[in-house]
Regions:
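Extended amphipathic alpha-helical segments with heptad-repeat/coiled-coil character used for oligomerization
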Residues: 172-181
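Conserved small/polar residues in nucleotide/adenosyl-binding loops
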Residues: 187-192
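A glycine-rich, hydrophobic loop/mini-helix early in the fold
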Residues: 40-108
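Conserved helix-adjacent loop modules within structured domains
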Residues: 81-150
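A general alpha-helix detector
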Residues: 6, 24-25, 42-46, 75, ...
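Helix-rich interaction surfaces within compact, conserved domain-sized segments
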Residues: 21-26, 141-144, 148-173
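A structured, charge-rich N-terminal accessory region that forms the first stable segment of a protein
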Residues: 2-56
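Short, hydrophobic/amphipathic alpha-helical patches that form generic packing surfaces
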Residues: 2-13, 77-78, 116-120, 160-163
Length: 194
């Protein structure tokens, strides 16, 4: 599924290679068979807007959004296991899956990094890839909602992934979780000021 490769690349740290290979991304988007016209257009707009930004500004915003704090971390197991011991075993298991399909990791890459997981899914037959997306759909929906709350354009990528997964995510539960997080944050801020 070429769409997973495109979204994977757009969820990586923006760099000069993104600018250098932009035409390949637009060509891949044009060849998509799994996106309707509206979704392909949204993805194209996101890509154009990202490329139009100053690279250093895009990098700073990316780091602020995805590298600081757990709420919008692109490390999938962060949202499932937190800092528990189960996270380590889950990573070992995922690395085993990658190796079974011939994917070799760079020693600096964590196996639960969403762009890497999407690259892995893109190599699988469509039904297996969709199953893998469905497995993480609740995390994707939660991340998308948190990004919408922050008014980030990256939210469109998560909405698209949930739609591609064709998963039934309880949007009411996601909204309640986001509202609860906002309430707790507000309470902490108010209690820290005498």
């Amino acid at each position: 599924m070429i769409e997973l490769v495109i979204v994977s690349r757009l969820l990586e740290y923006p760099d000069a290679a993104l600018v250098q290979h932009q035409q390949e991304l637009f060509d891949a988007l044009a060849s998509s068979e799994n996106l309707d016209k509206e979704d392909a257009q949204k993805l194209g707009v996101f890509l154009r807007d990202l490329l139009a930004r100053d690279l250093l500004d895009a990098q700073a915003d990316y780091s602020q959004l995805f590298d600081r704090g757990r709420a919008t971390s692109l490390l999938l197991f962060e949202h499932v296991h937190g800092e528990s011991r189960d996270r380590g075993q889950a990573m070992v298991d995922l690395m085993g899956q990658y190796e079974q399909h011939g994917l070799q990791l760079d020693s600096r890459e964590l196996p639960d990094h969403l762009p890497l997981y999407l690259e892995y899914l893109a190599q699988l037959p469509k039904e297996e890839a969709l199953g893998g997306l469905q497995d993480i759909a609740p995390i994707l929906a939660l991340l998308g909602a948190r990004l919408q709350q922050r008014e980030s354009s990256y939210a469109v990528l998560f909405d698209l992934l949930v739609k591609l997964a064709n998963a039934s995510v309880d949007s009411q539960k996601v909204a309640e979780k986001i509202a609860d997080e906002a309430d707790r944050k507000s309470t902490r801020l108010n209690s820290s000021h005498p």
